[in-house]
Regions:
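A short beta-loop-alpha structural element at the N-terminal edge
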Residues: 4-18, 22
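Active-site rim helix/loop that mediates acceptor-substrate recognition in acyltransferases
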Residues: 37-60
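Conserved beta-hairpin
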Residues: 56-74, 134-136
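Conserved acyl-donor/pantetheine-binding loop and adjacent beta-alpha core of acyl/acetyltransferases
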Residues: 72-134, 140, 190
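Conserved GNAT acetyl-CoA-binding A-motif
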Residues: 126-128, 155-168
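Conserved beta-strand-loop-alpha-helix junction that forms the acyl-donor binding cleft
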Residues: 131-140, 164-173, 188-194, 200-202
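Conserved acetyl-CoA-binding loop-helix of GNAT-fold acetyltransferases
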Residues: 132-135, 141-154, 178
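Conserved active-site alpha-helix within GNAT-family acetyltransferase domains
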Residues: 146, 158, 169-186, 192
């Protein structure tokens, strides 16, 4: 089934953040950081709102008309998340992290530093960065993820630009490999001791 893909509007940011919480609330990394479901929801809705707001300002957020999935992309030249850019988008991402418990914040930031260091080391040329891809649980397995990736993958191929991402599950590794990504490095994410895969997609001619 072919799914329509549209650009998320800023007025839809809160709805998109709630959808992403629904998509990721059972992921092991967030269950490790926030064992209590109420605290997890509160932390994630603020954090994902910050991610979406940042990507709307500096990149592209693709979704479906009914907002059942979302892909947050940062383009070549903007793929590095910086504090200055976070400030320009209203500190939403910082507010989310500050709202974590001290222990969760320490563990989360250890993971962030690890992924940022690997990102800089593994891909040094201009590239698209898939910061976040989430699909509502009741739509997973029905082609939404592929549809949300396709517009930017096609543009990257046309422009001869690679793409980069990180993922924390083997199931996602299989999914991304089918879309042309290859594992560049694997490791354990500090703070949570969970696996992380760093993946790169070279442009397809």
């Amino acid at each position: 089934m072919k799914h329509e893909v549209v650009t998320l509007q800023r007025s839809q940011l809160a709805q998109a953040a709630e959808m992403l919480v629904w998509a990721f609330q059972s992921d092991q990394i967030y269950c490790e950081l926030f064992p209590q479901s109420d605290a997890r929801h509160k932390a994630l809705v603020t954090m994902f709102g910050g991610v979406v707001g940042y990507a709307l300002h500096y990149g592209e957020v693709l979704t479906t008309p009914e907002i059942r999935g979302g892909a947050c992309w940062l383009p070549p030249g903007q793929a590095k998340v910086t504090l200055w850019r976070i400030a320009r988008t209203g500190f939403g991402l910082v507010r989310g992290i500050v709202g974590f418990s001290q222990e969760a914040r320490k563990r989360f930031m250890a993971g962030v530093m690890h992924t940022e260091t690997a990102h800089k080391r593994l891909i040094t040329v201009p590239h698209w960065y898939l910061w976040l891809l989430g699909v509502a649980p009741d739509r997973q397995g029905h082609g939404y993820g592929s549809a949300l990736l396709q517009p930017i993958l096609a543009r990257a191929d046309q422009d001869g630009v690679p793409c980069y991402l990180e993922t924390q599950t083997e199931r996602n590794v299989v999914f991304y490999r089918r879309r042309g990504f290859e594992v560049a490095e694997t490791g354990l994410m500090p703070g949570v001791d969970l696996p992380v895969w760093h993946m790169v997609r070279t442009p397809h001619g």
